[in-house]
C-alpha cells in the first residue's frame, strides 16, 4: 500500500517520476481507478513483476486482507498503457527470491 499511496500523493501534487519497478508487491491489484491515476505521473511506466508461486503473499496477505489479491501474485488490473505486468513465476519461486534473480528478471524485459 505504501508505494501505491505514495504514487497517488505524487499524482495529486502533479509531481512526475521516471519509472517504477514493483517486485512481489503487497497491495491490491484491483483498484483500477487508483492504478490508472498513479500511472499518469510515471513517464516510462509502472512495471509490475509478480509470481504466482509466492506463498508468503498467497497465504499471509490474503488472510490479513480478507481474501484480496495482491499485485505480487497477479497482474495489476488496469487498462492504462503505462502499466506493464510481467509473470516471473518460472524464475521466482518464492517471495524472497526476487533479489537473487533480479539480473535475470531485468535482462528478460
PLM features: residue spans?
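C-terminal catalytic-base region of ester-bond hydrolases, centering on the histidine
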Residues: 57-109
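Serine-dependent carboxylesterase/thioesterase catalytic core
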Residues: 1-71
Amino acid at each position: 500500500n505504501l508505494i501505491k499511496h505514495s504514487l497517488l500523493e505524487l499524482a495529486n501534487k502533479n509531481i512526475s517520476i521516471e519509472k517504477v519497478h514493483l517486485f512481489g508487491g503487497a497491495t491490491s491489484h484491483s483498484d483500477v481507478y487508483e492504478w490508472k491515476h498513479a500511472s499518469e505521473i510515471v513517464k516510462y511506466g509502472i512495471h509490475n513483476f509478480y509470481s504466482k508461486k509466492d506463498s508468503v503473499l498467497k497465504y499471509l496477505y490474503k488472510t490479513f486482507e480478507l481474501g484480496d489479491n495482491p499485485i505480487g501474485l497477479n497482474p495489476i488490473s488496469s487498462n492504462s498503457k503505462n502499466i506493464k505486468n510481467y509473470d516471473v513465476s518460472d524464475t521466482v519461486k518464492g517471495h524472497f527470491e526476487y533479489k537473487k534473480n533480479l539480473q535475470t528478471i531485468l535482462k528478460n524485459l
